[in-house]
Amino acid sequence: MTLVDVRTPDPKRFIPGATGDWEVIVGMEVHAQVLSNSKLFSGASTEFGKPQNSNVSMVDAAMPGMLPVINEECVKQAVRTGLGLKAQINKRSLFDRKNYFYPDLPQGYQISQFKDPIVGEGKIVISLGPDRQGQFEDIEIGIERLHLEQDAGKSMHDQHATMSYVDLNRSGVALMEIVSKPDMRSSDEAKAYMTKLRSIVRYLGTCDGNMDEGSMRADVNVSVRRPGEDFGTRCEIKNVNSIRFIGQAIEYEARRQIGILEDGGKIDQETRLFDPNKGETRSMRSKEDAHDYRYFPDPDLLPLEFDDAFIKALEADLPELPDDKKERFVRELGLSIYDASVLVSEKAIADYFEAVAAGRDGKTAANWVINDLLGALNRTGKDIEQTPVSPAQLGAIIDLIKAGTISGKIAKDLFEIVLAEGGDPAEIVEARGMKQVTDTGAIEKAVDEIIAANPDQVEKVKAKPTMAAWFVGQVMKATGGKANPQAVQALVKAKLGIEE
C-alpha cells in the first residue's frame, strides 16, 4: 500500500524539539466486535462474561474436520458499517488465512481478508474545538478499508503458578478491522477520530463500542518527521483500550521517537505495548510485514458476493447518523453547533434529548439536558443509561416553568429533588409548597419592605437605573425564589420610577 499525504503541515500542531519542529503522523487500525448473537463462522454464543470456555463450538476449537460457515448477520453488519462510513462496498470479497502461531489461536491461522476486503475507501469527518473565537475545525480522516476477521482466544497467566491457561470464549467472534489512512496529526485528532468512530457504530447498532469489555480496541501507528518531509518509520502500539490511553500513548511515543532521532539514532519498525500505569510504551516484538503471515485464500470458504439490491436494502434501513442529526438539530431547533455536537455525541443522549424536546422549545430542552442533567451525571459518575431522571420527568419540570407554576430558581431545586428521590414533579411542587407566588399584592408588600429598608440603595438606583436588579434579587431571596421574576421586576421599576 502506497501512503499518500493529504494534509498540509499545520504549525499549531508541530511538536517543538531540541533541534527544531517535528510533526507526528498517526494512523489507526480499530478492531470493533460485531454485534451479533453468534460468531463469524460458528453458532456459538458471543455473550460477554460467561464462564471460561463455555461459548466454544467444535469450529472455534479447531477440531479436525470442522468447517466454517459464514454468519450472514455479520456480513450485513459489516456492510452497514461501511455505508455509515460513506465507503465503497465491494460486491465481491475473499477470506484469507493469516498464518501465525499463538497459544490462543487453535487453528494455527486466523481467517481474515487481505487483498479483497468487504469494504473499501471511506471517510470520517472529525470536529475539533471550539477555539477561543467559538469556531470549530472540521477535518476529514480517510478510511483505507474495513474487513471481517476472527478474534483470537485469551491467554491467562494469573490462574496458576507455573502454567498458562486459554479461554476460547472469544475465539471466532466476528471483528471488523477498520483501517484509517495516516491522516491524523495530533493526539487530539486521534481521540476525536476514535470518539466519532465509536459513536457511528453505536448509532448503526453494529458494535456496542464498550472499550472496557474489549469490544473495541485500537492498534495505533505512530511516526514522526520534520514538517513537509516524507513519512518516517512507524511503530505500532497494540490493543489500546481507552480513548484517554490512545492520547497518552501517542504523546509518549512521539516524544520517544523525537528523542531518538535528535540523538542521531534511527527508529526501528516494531510493535509496542502501552503501559497505562507508567504512561509509556515498551517494545513487544519487531513489526511483521504482510509476507511474514503467508496469506492465501481460505479453501473452505467461497467468495462473498452480493448485488446492488442487497446493498440498497441495507442502506434504506440505516438510522440517522450523528452528522445528519447534528445538522437537523441546528437547522430545525435553532441549537448552536456546540450544543448539537454534545447532544449527538452519544446515541443515548440524542434519544433522551429528542424525547424531552418533543412538543417543547428545543433550546430550553437542550439547556436542561446539557447543563443540568449531564452536569449532574458527571458529578455522580453515571452515564445517560443510568440517569435517575427520565425524559418525562425533565419534560414535566420544563412544562411547570412554562406554565408559570414555578420559577427558574425553584425548577433547579425541583430537579435536584427528582434526581435524588424520584417522583412526579407536579406532585412534588404541590406537596412541598413550591408554587410560584403570582399574587401581586404579596409581591408588592415584599418590594415595599425591601425598598423601605434600603434607602441608600434607592439613591444609587436613581443615579444608575441598572442597579434595580439588586432589588429584584433581594425580593426573590425574601420570597424563597417563589415570586414571579417578571412581576417582581415590573413592580420594582414602577416603585422606583424607572421607565421601561
From Swiss-Prot:
Q: What class of enzyme is it?
A: ligase
Residues in a coiled coil are: none
Keywords assigned by UniProt?
ATP-binding, Ligase, Nucleotide-binding, Protein biosynthesis
Task: Kindly state which reaction or reactions the protein catalyses.
Answer: L-glutamyl-tRNA(Gln) + L-glutamine + ATP + H2O = L-glutaminyl-tRNA(Gln) + L-glutamate + ADP + phosphate + H(+); L-aspartyl-tRNA(Asn) + L-glutamine + ATP + H2O = L-asparaginyl-tRNA(Asn) + L-glutamate + ADP + phosphate + 2 H(+)
Q: Which GO terms describe its biological process?
A: glutaminyl-tRNAGln biosynthesis via transamidation; translation
What the protein does? Answer: Allows the formation of correctly charged Asn-tRNA(Asn) or Gln-tRNA(Gln) through the transamidation of misacylated Asp-tRNA(Asn) or Glu-tRNA(Gln) in organisms which lack either or both of asparaginyl-tRNA or glutaminyl-tRNA synthetases. The reaction takes place in the presence of glutamine and ATP through an activated phospho-Asp-tRNA(Asn) or phospho-Glu-tRNA(Gln).
Family of this protein:
Belongs to the GatB/GatE family. GatB subfamily.
Q: Which NCBIfam families match?
A: gatB, PRK05477.1-2, PRK05477.1-4, PRK05477.1-5
Name recorded for this polypeptide: Aspartyl/glutamyl-tRNA(Asn/Gln) amidotransferase subunit B
